[in-house]
Amino acid sequence: ILNTKGILRLIESVPSPKAEPFKMWLAEVGRERIDETIDPELTIERALETYLKKGYSREWINQRLQAIQVRKELTDEWDSRGVKQGVEYAILTDEITKAWSGMTTRQYKNLKGLTKENLRDNMSTLELVLNMLAEATTTEISKEKNPQTFVDNRKVAKEGGEVAGNARKDIEERTGKPVITSKNAVDFSNLISDVIDTEYDKNE
């Protein structure tokens, strides 16, 4: 079974003229990636453009881009502690998610009806903010406690998540409604469209 890389290499090797549009697209994507390596700001601009095309609000996009930065700071901290990318990243992320949301990452994705989609891309603004709080707090606790082993890092991840978990419970107590929602990107896009349509009707 071919993976994504294998499929792309197969397309490149096809001599048929029908494959030319795909080859041109691959070349364009490659050029964009090189440009982004030279000027990282292009990555942010491209992400902003992509989210806008998907129908997200600017408020949500600003939070999402900030969440990317918070996540990067956390993974940089993990790297400095010897945490391995892949399985160990996933375990620590799961620890954080479970501590603040009460669910594992998989359970959270199931709630939103997701398979391979990015969970953060399907969070509400408040969910994103709490997830950021959990990750940013984990980073700060790690810097202070200087964990030496993976077990230590796991404890720190749980502590960071619990801070955001307490904030979530406080919000829910004060608002009388759950923070975590089954709504995903499709629902958010539809909501934005409805608001735009309503405003348009008012101005007609």
Map each language-model feature to its residues.
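Positively charged, phosphate-engaging catalytic surfaces used for nucleic-acid and nucleotide handling
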Residues: 2-6, 12-204
